[in-house]
Every structure is written in structure tokens, then in C-alpha cells.
From Swiss-Prot:
GO terms for molecular function: acetyltransferase activator activity; phospholipid scramblase activity. It comes from the Eukaryota. Disulfide bonds: none annotated. Signal peptide: none annotated. It comes from Homo sapiens. Belongs to the TDE1 family. It catalyses: a 1,2-diacyl-sn-glycero-3-phospho-L-serine(in) = a 1,2-diacyl-sn-glycero-3-phospho-L-serine(out); a 1,2-diacyl-sn-glycero-3-phosphocholine(in) = a 1,2-diacyl-sn-glycero-3-phosphocholine(out); a 1,2-diacyl-sn-glycero-3-phosphoethanolamine(in) = a 1,2-diacyl-sn-glycero-3-phosphoethanolamine(out). GO terms for biological process: phosphatidylserine metabolic process; plasma membrane phospholipid scrambling. Non-ATP-dependent, non-specific lipid transporter for phosphatidylserine, phosphatidylcholine, and phosphatidylethanolamine. Functions as a scramblase that flips lipids in both directions across the membrane. In contrast to SERINC3 and SERINC5, has no effect on HIV-1 particles infectivity. One of its GO terms (cellular component) is plasma membrane. The chain crosses the membrane at residues 5-27, 40-57, 96-118, 131-150, 160-182, 202-224, 239-256, 268-290, 317-339, 385-407, 422-444. The lineage of its organism: Eukaryota, Metazoa, Chordata, Craniata, Vertebrata. This is Serine incorporator 2. It is found in: Cell membrane.
Amino acid sequence: MGACLGACSLLSCASCLCGSAPCILCSCCPASRNSTVSRLIFTFFLFLGVLVSIIMLSPGVESQLYKLPWVCEEGAGIPTVLQGHIDCGSLLGYRAVYRMCFATAAFFFFFTLLMLCVSSSRDPRAAIQNGFWFFKFLILVGLTVGAFYIPDGSFTNIWFYFGVVGSFLFILIQLVLLIDFAHSWNQRWLGKAEECDSRAWYAGLFFFTLLFYLLSIAAVALMFMYYTEPSGCHEGKVFISLNLTFCVCVSIAAVLPKVQDAQPNSGLLQASVITLYTMFVTWSALSSIPEQKCNPHLPTQLGNETVVAGPEGYETQWWDAPSIVGLIIFLLCTLFISLRSSDHRQVNSLMQTEECPPMLDATQQQQQVAACEGRAFDNEQDGVTYSYSFFHFCLVLASLHVMMTLTNWYKPGETRKMISTWTAVWVKICASWAGLLLYLWTLVAPLLLRNRDFS
């Protein structure tokens, strides 16, 4: 009898791994939407790849592996297996990050193509999107193993340019998410203020708006102090001054009477969030300048703690402050992509999500939740609540962005010091300008396209 019960339990677990609902994950949680759970699991796969990349890039890991005679074969070449030995030089360092992120990007790009034009959970492909997690994990592992057998050759050089484009686009997506977050925040607090007839909510909005602007001003002052010199660093001075001017312009545009008439919820809170994010991107760009006198984050030859002996003798610019902050923002934005449900029409249009996902009435929804307690329930029978394909494309871009972040935008073959290049500087600065234009468009679009509904 015990064996029968055990077999039944294993069959139940197998059905969860191979079926259309991630019930193992949700068995200890309240009933949740299938669409949300699926996005969270895909995001977990991405975070798993990021964790492996960080481990491979960590100082000391290679030296520890070299102590195991059955693991590593001395030498620096392409990833090969010789008599059961593995070349650790190809497994660790920036090349490992490139290959790991190639595997995750290829994994999500496959699902980007597979999930094109899925309109509801009745589509057979929706079952693949929301289930078969064990097989998906095996596919990801297989792609990862295969990626380490790609010969070096021109792979890393070509993949670097894919990373540049993908990171540029993901920076824009991060800004779109911030616009959405700030808009939702402003709208909710204004609604609370009207419901409760309390000025405390207005005071809260004023406090955070002022805080974000003060932080932005402090950032400008610190960047001028540490990333410029009176007689040099002209590029940094121009970048800081231009972005400060552009942020002032969009802040003024956000409170213009005509903009307020067209979008009553537009205000300085959103502008302050965008301004602070722009200052962060500017800071990140300045920290990528490959000139010692204009960039205090560059490693020096005098025992700077950021210098790490990487695989094959490369010196790694390891975990400076902009990289850490950028990685935190990346994690938060990726989670936000998985959990978000926007009420901003223009953001939904940009992010390929629906403004009002299909909903049941209150009684039907309570019955569905009660029936599905302890597992995910299908909330997309009448229509998907987000674009499956675009979600996976965002994760492709996220994989490329984290690849560039972890490797400090290092261009293979350019130098044996893994430091950023001018390419990184210009990509980040151009992304900040494009982001400001994108935010400005969300402000003026209702004025320019009067025949469209932006309410």
C-alpha cells in the first residue's frame, strides 16, 4: 500500500512538472494567476543564469578549480574536453559570462518565436508557455552546456555587438517601466487623497518629488566633483550639462497647462523619477570612461582593491558602485516585468500588455479561486493578459544587458584589462537621451494626436 501511495505521489509530481500548471510551486501558496506564476518561473530561470555567471566571474573560483586535478586541464584555448579534463580558462571569466548569457538569450529567443500571435490559453502553445517546466529546464541546461563548446574565434567579438544593442534597448525598457511605476504611484496617491479628503497624501507626493530632485542635484554636483577636472574631461562636462538641461526641460513640460489639461495625472513626481534615473545612467556612463583622470573607478597599478587577476591574466574592473546599483535596478525591473499590471494606456501600448485584462465577475472569480486553492488558475481563457512573445523578448534583452553589466562592457581582444570602452559610454548616453525623448512623447502625444484616446 505504501509503495502504491508513493507511486501515486510521484505521478502527481510528474504531472506538475510536465503538465500545464506549475502546481508544485504553488502548492504551498494561495491560489494565483497562471499568467503571473509562469512569468515568475521564467524570470527565475534568468536569475539562475545570472547567478551562475556571477559565480564563474568571481575571484578565486578558477584557482580553486585548478586544485582539483580531475577537473581542469592547464592551458588557455577553446572549450574542449581532453581525456576527461576541462579547460578552466574557457569556463571562467568574461568568456563564461558571454556563453552563459548566450544560452539564456537563445532560450528566451526560442520562446519569443514560438509564442508569436498566441491570443488565449485555448491556443495549444499556451500549454507550453504555462507548463512543462522540467523539460524547459533541461533545454536551458542543454543550451548552456552547448554554449561552452562554441569555439572562441569571432564568437565573443560578434556577441559583444549583440550585447551592445540589447543593453541599449533594455535601458529604454527600464525607463518605460519607471514611467509606468511613477504614473501608477501618482494616480493611486491622488486617488487616496480624494477618497480620504486628507492632505497627508499630497504631502507624501511632495516629499518624494522633492527628495528625488534633491538626489538628482546632489548627483550632478558629485559627478562634476569626481568625474571632471578644471582643465580636462570635457566629454564628461558636456554629458552632465546636457542631461541636466534636458531633465529641466521635461520637468517643465510635465506641468505645462496644456499637458495638464490633456493628462491630469501628469506631474512632477513622474518627472523627478525620470530625472533621477537619467542621472544614474549618466553616472554609469561616466564610470565607463576609459581614462584614469576622468574616472575614479578605473583600476590602477598601485594596489587598488578593484583590480582582480582574472582568468588568463586579465585584470578585471570588479564590482564598482555603478555596476552594483545597475544590477539591483536590473533585478527589480525584471521582477516588475513579471508582476506588473499597468493602467497607463501608452505604457501598455509600448510594452504590449492589455490595459484591462479579461476579468470574471466577483462571484465567478471567488468560485474559481476557491476551486483552485493551492495552485495556479487559468485567467486567460478569454484572452492573454500580456504578450507572451514580447515578454520573452524582454528577457532576451535582459540577458544581454546583464552580460554587459557583469563584464563591464569589456570588448574582447581590445586590451588585457577588463575595463569599459567608449562604446559603453556612448551607448548609455544615447540611451538616456532616447529615454528622455520617450518620456517627452508620453507627455505631448495627446496634444499631437488629438484623434486618439489617451485617457
